[in-house]
Each structure stands twice: as structure tokens, then as C-alpha cells.
């Protein structure tokens, strides 16, 4: 057998990409091992790529993980974090029993953490909730959850909070990372989530990355892009960012733009398409309609902030007005090549190269983006703008062409968005503000009419403000670390958590920054210590079975939610008007109403699977996960969100919804791929009754905060390959911690020299909100342009979010972690 040039190039591309991302090459014969290790599948615990791994267990512990060679997503590859998954659960400081702040044998806000039983923990939680509900509205009781929560857990949370306690104040940390993408999907297409799939990578001839360092944040997908680029000379890669990172190593067109100027660049591309007669009129006329967005909409700041007070249309930020092509043309017309260059600082030849790629009808192209796009005070707009250029050219919903929003968490799509753990959402793209949607959910859950409030609760940043202001008095945080990951910690988060009027609960496997700031810590099971399901960025739903038990008294979030529901009777949390509709519910617990309701509890636990463990099923006496999933999945079936039956997912490496007649959907809205598109329609954006997507005209507007004479640099925050989010898991893996032990500040050498600083110096980063001390890096992997510094938030010893501004997109409520003003001095 000969190895031809193409095979050689492909092999080298895969190896090079693997090496760059610290990946392991798959071992095919793991099942054949005779060392007593039992192997089973599970999706990776980290990012939203959705890699499948093989988990090896022995003597009740996870002892090894490998890339799953049978998985289509990662094809046996692991990134460096995935390689060390077996160690994330075994940090020496696992929390193994509930811990309550106590003094003199009673709860005290300033007391020491003292071990208590689960019954004691739930009793004081229930007392606090009931007391608040007697005095205040239900939205005064809140939950802050996560895009790492399993589908089963997320659904159980939504049922308890919205259907039981009648509070819509439940939001995920996905509000910080994916809310703008989700809102723009809903506004543009009438439905959430990408239309394409990862197969686009092998089908396209061009990749444009907007604010996405895929080489470090989605390394397995980057390995596939690298393979595609290095094995075909015609394939081109454009990488766009406010600083140079590892993804630039593969870029044919590397573009550094000024913070916030992506708005101007995208409007220039739209203008270029129009001025050069490259509009796909057949597609536009058949499949789109035009709208104009509200302008001068503010920055999601507190109402008394000067920038917020000056905004004319903050109260109508999300409004869209009927429009037409001519008005859209006028909106983008000012964004000439010269204007885009002036605003962005990007050389004109690079801007033209980019515009021509989008405009060329023969050029297949996929746009990828993540937090650089979404964490933006105009994040919804900029998402709309990238849809605009794909819709104007018809480069959408077809193999190798489309806009693709990548998620940063393993189930930001599957749980936060699809299940609906946001303050305004319900399952399957339904919302609490739509009375018809509420009626559908109440009927399915067998609840009295009017149980679910039709007013959204407090979203993520607003939760912190309301805790501080005393309007939100109970918060249960699960599977996230907002005291480290949220913005403006000193001014807006910490004060509310330590407000003596409030009671804060944190479910966490480790003593995170959030946990040690709470009043009660609940020990939670991790990853394969429970049965679970995730939904990744390409709409792929994946299941796994429990493979080991959690340590000590650790319990899964699912067990915690469902067990906690037993501590409430309907008479204690529902008013007489609701009880009068269904008197049979009087005296019943929320557990009986929501979970042991004849639907969730109707499936028996499997008895024919060797070595099967399911702690929740054993405790509650039925197959809780299956009951929750089948009740939840019924909302989407027949409505474009079809999921397969529960048992199927345990047999496969995931399926991309909608799954109809056992067949997954690769490209939505396109005839021949999507079962909801009728013969002869070609394309159908069926999320709207008229089956047309929206092209939205909006302008460039200034950021919330910019450098000035005192705070003379831009601050951008983000991550590194070795660590994930706040490092709660990865910093407890010795190999990952040693590889990148502490946060750094990356700066241009000339900026350092101008301040009398050198590489390695200890420096102080100072904003209007706070300061941290770190070390300077002028030579490392991230190369900043003059005027901008970059730092990360994984290091609990350097709380970078003391610095960040709590400005949000006014439409989505998503935080802008990428842009605020900072100064750097020697420490």
C-alpha cells in the first residue's frame, strides 16, 4: 500500500492539529483490555463541541479516559482537557457533606461552615423560601444554573421553579455566553440554534472566525478545520480578533480589528454585496423579509448610570419595525470601505478580501463565532448582521454554507436553550410571555391555569443587582461559579451574597469562590457519578449512564431538586384561586404534583444491564431520568424540535434534532435534509408562519466604556487552552495546573516599554471597579496590539472579574466581558 501526497498531507494535518491542542491519538482496542477496566461512553464534561469519550472504571473509580473512535464528532481525538477528565473528580478537597454557616448551634450569616444532614439543609432552605413567599412575590426566590447542567436536571429545575414555586427567576450562566446568539436566532428565524452541523467543515472551502479562538477553545473542531485547510490548497481561513492568538497560525487572512468595530465591518460587507450587485435576489425575494431595529438602546446598566440615562430607547430596545430593501440599503450605505477602515483599523485590502468572499456566489463559506461576538453590548445586533450577509447571498442551510454559533458549555444548547432554563423561556422555544405557550405547558404538567407567571424573572446580571438591593432574597446556585465568573464582583455580586436579608445556597463539588461566599454548601455529584444527557452546538443530543458513585454524601443536582420538592405542600406556595381549580392537589407535596404525577414516574428502572448504577432511580423507586425526558421531549415532537425516544440515545453517539422516523437532520430548513420542508419549497424558515427569515438593519453604535486619559487601555478577558472557565475542575488536575498555574496579563512590548514595564514584571490592573495583581507577558501565545491587554478568569487567586463592567446587551441581557477601560502600573 502506497501513501499518496493527499493521504500524507491529511495525516500530517491531523497530527499537527493534535499536537497543537495537546490531543491524544485514539486507541482502537480499548474494549479488548484485560486489566479489569470497564469501559463505557460519555460526552466530554467541558466545552460545547460534544466530543465522545470512553470512560474506564475500576474498583468504583474512573481510572482512564480515551477519545471515542466511534464518535463522529471527535473521531477518537481528545484535547488536553479531555485527556485528563479522569482526574477532575478526585481533587483532595471534594465537598462530601452539606455545610451550613452556624454559630452557637444555629444558622448565622457570619458563622463557620458546619456539617449538617441533608434534611437539616433542606429544612432551612424550605423555611427561607416559604417565609419569603409569604411576604413577597415569587420572583424574589431565585435560581442560577448552568449550561453544564444535564437535560434531566434542567427540566426538573424548570418544573420546580416555574411550575411549583411559581418563580421565573431561574437563569443559566449561558446568559453570560450564549444569550445574544439565542435571541438573534429567535428573532431572525423564529427558532433557536444553528441550521448547519459539523459536516459543514468538510464541505466548505472557506472559514471565517469572528471572535473565536477555536484552536484553544474548540480544539477538536479546529483539528478538523486544520485537516480541511492543509489538505486542499483552495480552502481559505480568515481569523478575526482584537488580538492575535493561536488560531492565527493557520490564517490565510489574519485580521486584527479595534474592539466593537465588528458592527461596522459587517455592515460594510452588506453594503459591498449590494453595491456590487451580488444580492441573491431569487433567495431574498422568496425567503426573507426586512426589518429595522430600534437604535440608541442603552447598555443594560443600572438606570441611574449616566450612559443608561442618556439612552433614548432603552425601554424599547428589542423593538423591530417593518421595513424593505431600500431602507436597509440606506442603513448600510454609509459603511463604505473607507468608513469601515476608519472605524476598525483593518487595512482596506483585507476588508475587500473578506467582503469578496461573502459576495462571490461560487464561494462556499462558513462563519464561526463564540464569545468575542456574543459577549458584546450589541451582541444581538452583531449576530443579526452575520445572518444578514448569509441571507443576502443565500449562503445558508446548505452543505458547506452557513452561519454557525459555537457554544462554550456542554449543554448550553441542550439544557439552557432547548429545555428553557432562562427567565423567559419554556421547553421547545416556548416563552412565558406567550399565554398560549404557558397554557400548553400547564396542561402538559397537569397544573391549574395561571400557575406559571407570564412575567420573566430576574436574569443573571439583574439577579446580582436585586440581591444587593434586597428585592431577591433567596438564591440557589448550581453547577456554576458566578462569584468568580460574573462581572463587577466587588460592586455588584459580593454585596448581595453577604446581604444579611438574603440566603445563598451553592451546590458544588469543590469549595469554589462561590461556595465559600455562600450560606449553605451542598455537595454535588459530577459527570459520570450520575446518569445524564447533554446537547451540543450542532443540535446533537447525547446520553451517558452513571458509572461510579459520588464520594461521601454527594448527591446529583437532579436528586437535590426532586428531593427538595418534598419539603413544600401546595397549600404553602399556591394561592386559593389555583387550589380551587384542582382541589385534589390540596395537601399534596410539590414532589407529588410535579414528579410522582403518573407521567414522570411511569418507567421502571432497567434490570437487564450488567453493572448498571442509578442512584436516583434507586432512591425514588422509578426511572426518573427516562420519565423526565419523555415528558419533556413531547413538547418538541411535531414542532420541529423532535427528539428520538429515550432508549435510542443510549445506543448511539448522539443524534441531531429534529429526529423524525429515526432519522437525524443535518441541515435544517433545506429540502432534502429537513423533514419539515415540503417538496418544492427548497428552503423554508418555518419558525415563522410566513416561512421567511428577517434581515435586520441596525447601525454601528459606541461601546459602553472606552479608554480615556486615565484608563488608557482596552481590557479583554477570556480563557486559555489548559483551563476551563473558573478552573474549579481543571486547576485540581495536577498536570493542567502545572502546565499553566496562574493567570497572566498579555501586553504589546511597546505598551510595556512606555510604562517602564518588562516581561515578567508584577503589575497591577486597575479599572473604575477594582484591581488585581498579576504578571506581565509580552512574548507568549497571545500577542496584543498596542492599546489592548488580555487576561483570563480561571485563577481564583486573581479575580479578573473585579475589573469587568456589568454592561449587557439591552435585548439579550448578555454581559460584555470583552471591552472596558483599564490602566496598568507596576505593582
Swiss-Prot record:
Mod. after translation: Predicted to be exported by the Tat system. The position of the signal peptide cleavage has not been experimentally proven.
Major subcellular site: periplasm
Role summary: Catalytic subunit of the periplasmic nitrate reductase complex NapAB. Receives electrons from NapB and catalyzes the reduction of nitrate to nitrite.
Cofactor(s) the record lists: [4Fe-4S] cluster; Mo-bis(molybdopterin guanine dinucleotide)
EC code(s) of this entry: 1.9.6.1
GO biological process: cellular respiration; Mo-molybdopterin cofactor biosynthetic process; nitrate assimilation
Subunit structure: Component of the periplasmic nitrate reductase NapAB complex composed of NapA and NapB.
Protein name: Periplasmic nitrate reductase
Domain 4Fe-4S Mo/W bis-MGD-type, first and last residues per copy: 37-93
Annotated [4Fe-4S] cluster binding sites: 44, 47, 51, 79
Keyword check for Membrane: no
Location relative to the cell: Periplasm
Keyword hit for Lipid biosynthesis: no
Keywords: 4Fe-4S, Electron transport, Iron, Iron-sulfur, Metal-binding, Molybdenum, Nitrate assimilation, Oxidoreductase, Periplasm, Signal, Transport
Binding site for substrate: 793
Recorded name of the encoding gene: napA
Record text on cofactor binding: Binds 1 [4Fe-4S] cluster. Binds 1 molybdenum-bis(molybdopterin guanine dinucleotide) (Mo-bis-MGD) cofactor per subunit.
Molecular function (Gene Ontology), one example: molybdenum ion binding
SUPFAM superfamilies the UniProt entry points to: ADC-like (SSF50692), Formate dehydrogenase/DMSO reductase, domains 1-3 (SSF53706)
UniProt family annotation: Belongs to the prokaryotic molybdopterin-containing oxidoreductase family. NasA/NapA/NarB subfamily.
An example Gene Ontology CC term for this record: periplasmic space
Residues that, per the record, bind Mo-bis(molybdopterin guanine dinucleotide): 81, 148, 173, 177, 210-217, 241-245, 371, 375, 481, 507-508, 530, 557, 717-726, 801, 818
Amino acid at each position: 500500500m502506497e501513501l499518496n501526497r493527499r493521504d500524507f498531507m491529511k495525516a500530517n494535518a491531523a497530527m499537527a492539529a493534535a499536537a497543537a491542542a495537546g490531543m491524544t491519538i485514539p486507541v482502537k482496542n480499548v474494549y479488548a483490555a484485560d486489566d479489569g477496566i470497564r469501559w463505557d461512553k460519555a460526552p466530554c464534561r467541558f466545552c460545547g463541541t460534544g466530543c465522545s469519550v470512553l470512560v474506564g472504571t475500576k474498583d468504583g473509580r474512573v481510572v482512564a479516559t480515551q477519545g471515542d473512535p466511534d464518535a463522529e464528532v471527535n473521531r477518537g481525538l481528545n484535547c488536553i482537557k479531555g485527556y485528563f477528565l479522569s482526574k477532575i473528580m478526585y481533587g483532595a478537597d471534594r465537598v462530601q457533606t452539606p455545610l451550613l454557616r452556624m454559630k452557637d448551634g444555629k444558622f448565622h450569616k457570619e458563622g463557620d461552615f458546619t456539617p449538617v444532614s441533608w434534611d437539616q439543609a433542606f429544612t432551612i432552605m424550605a423555611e427561607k423560601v416559604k417565609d419569603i413567599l409569604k411576604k413577597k412575590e415569587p420572583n424574589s426566590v431565585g435560581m442560577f444554573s448552568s449550561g453544564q447542567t444535564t437535560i434531566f436536571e434542567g427540566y426538573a429545575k424548570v418544573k420546580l421553579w416555574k411550575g411549583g414555586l411559581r418563580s421565573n427567576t431561574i437563569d443559566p450562566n449561558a446568559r453570560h455566553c450564549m444569550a445574544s446568539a439565542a435571541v438573534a436566532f429567535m428573532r431572525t428565524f423564529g427558532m433557536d440554534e444553528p441550521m448547519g452541523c459539523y459536516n459543514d467543515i468538510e464541505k466548505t472551502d472557506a472559514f471565517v472566525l469572528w471572535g473565536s479562538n477555536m484552536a484553544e477553545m474548540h480544539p477538536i473542531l479546529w483539528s478538523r478545520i486544520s485537516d480541511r485547510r492543509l489538505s486542499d490548497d483552495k480552502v481559505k481561513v480568515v481569523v478575526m480578533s482584537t488580538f492575535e492568538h493561536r488560531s492565527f497560525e493557520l490564517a490565510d487572512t489574519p485580521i486584527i480589528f479595534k474592539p466593537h468595530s465588528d458592527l461596522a465591518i459587517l455592515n460594510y460587507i452588506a453594503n459591498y454585496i449590494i453595491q456590487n450587485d451580488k444580492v441573491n435576489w431569487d433567495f431574498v425575494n422568496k425567503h426573507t423579509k426586512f426589518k429595522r431595529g430600534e437604535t440608541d438602546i442603552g447598555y443594560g446598566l443600572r438606570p441611574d448610570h449616566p450612559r443608561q440615562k442618556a439612552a433614548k430607547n432603552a425601554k424599547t430596545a428589542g423593538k423591530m419595525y417593518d421595513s424593505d430593501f431600500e431602507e436597509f440599503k440606506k442603513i448600510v450605505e454609509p459603511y463604505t470601505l473607507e468608513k469601515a477602515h476608519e472605524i476598525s483599523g483593518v487595512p482596506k485590502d483585507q476588508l475587500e478580501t473578506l467582503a469578496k468572499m461573502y459576495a462571490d456566489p461560487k464561494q462556499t463559506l462558513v462563519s464561526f463565532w463564540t464569545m468575542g461576538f456574543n459577549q458584546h453590548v450589541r451582541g444581538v445586533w452583531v449576530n443579526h448582521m452575520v445572518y444578514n450577509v448569509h441571507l443576502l447571498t443565500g449562503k445558508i442551510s446548505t452543505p458547506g454554507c452557513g452561519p454557525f454559533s459555537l457554544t462554550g458549555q456542554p449543554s448550553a444548547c441542550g439544557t439552557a436553550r432547548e429545555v428553557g432554563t432562562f427567565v423567559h423561556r419554556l421547553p421547545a422555544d416556548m416563552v412565558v410571555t406567550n399565554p398560549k405557550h404557558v397554557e400548553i405547558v400547564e396542561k402538559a404538567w397537569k397544573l391549574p391555569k395561571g400557575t406559571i407567571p407570564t412575567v420573566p424573572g430576574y436574569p443573571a446580571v439583574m439577579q446580582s443587582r436585586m440581591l444587593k438591593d434586597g428585592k431577591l432574597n433567596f438564591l440557589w446556585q448550581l453547577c456554576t461559579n458566578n462569584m468568580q465568573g460574573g462581572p463587577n464582583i466587588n460592586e455588584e455580586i459580593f454585596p448581595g451574597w453577604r446581604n444579611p436579608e438574603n440566603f445563598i445556597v451553592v451546590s458544588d463539588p469543590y469549595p469554589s469562590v462561590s461556595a465559600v461566599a455562600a450560606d449553605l454548601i451542598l455537595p454535588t455529584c459530577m459527570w459520570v457519578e450520575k446518569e445524564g444527557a447533554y446537547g451540543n452546538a450542532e443540535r446533537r443530543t447525547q446520553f451517558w449512564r452513571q458509572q461510579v458513585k459520588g464520594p461521601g454524601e454527594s448527591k446529583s443536582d437532579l436528586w437535590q431538586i426532586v428531593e427538595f420538592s418534598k419539603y413544600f405542600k401546595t397549600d404553602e406556595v399556591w394561592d386559593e384561586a389555583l387550589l380551587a381549580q384542582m382541589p385534589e392537589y390540596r395537601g399534596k407535596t410539590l414532589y407529588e404534583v410535579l414528579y410522582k404525577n403518573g407521567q414522570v414516574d411511569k418507567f421502571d428502572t432497567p434490570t437487564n444491564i450488567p453493572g448498571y448504577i442509578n442512584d436516583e432511580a434507586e432512591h425514588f423507586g422509578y426511572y426518573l431520568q427516562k420519565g423526565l425526558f419523555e415528558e419533556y421531549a413531547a413538547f418538541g415532537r411535531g414542532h420541529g424540535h423532535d427528539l428520538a425516544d429515550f432508549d435510542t440515545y443510549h445506543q448511539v453517539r448522539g443524534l441531531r434534532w429534529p429526529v423524525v422516523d429515526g432519522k437525524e437532520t443535518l441541515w435544517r430548513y433545506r429540502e432534502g435534509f429537513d423533514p419539515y420542508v415540503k417538496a418544492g419549497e427548497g428552503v423554508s424558515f418555518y419558525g415563522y408562519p410566513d416561512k421567511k427569515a428577517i434581515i435586520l438593519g441596525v447601525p454601528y453604535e459606541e461601546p459602553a466604556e472606552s479608554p480615556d486619559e486615565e484608563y488608557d487601555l482596552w481590557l479583554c478577558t477570556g480563557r486559555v487552552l489548559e483551563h476551563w472557565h473558573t478552573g474549579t475542575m481543571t486547576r485540581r488536575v495536577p498536570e493542567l495546573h502545572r502546565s499553566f498555574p496562574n493567570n497572566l496579563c498579555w501586553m504589546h512590548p511597546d505598551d510595556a516599554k512606555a510604562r517602564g514595564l518588562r516581561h515578567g514584571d508584577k503589575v497591577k490592573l486597575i479599572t473604575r471597579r477594582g484591581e488585581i495583581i498579576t504578571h506581565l507577558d509580552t512574548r507568549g501565545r497571545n500577542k496584543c496590539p498596542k492599546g489592548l491587554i488580555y487576561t483570563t478568569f480561571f485563577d481564583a487567586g486573581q479575580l479578573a472579574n473585579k475589573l469587568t463592567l456589568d454592561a449587557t446587551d439591552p435585548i439579550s441581557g448578555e454581559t460584555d466581558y470583552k471591552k472596558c477601560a483599564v490602566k496598568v502600573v507596576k505593582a
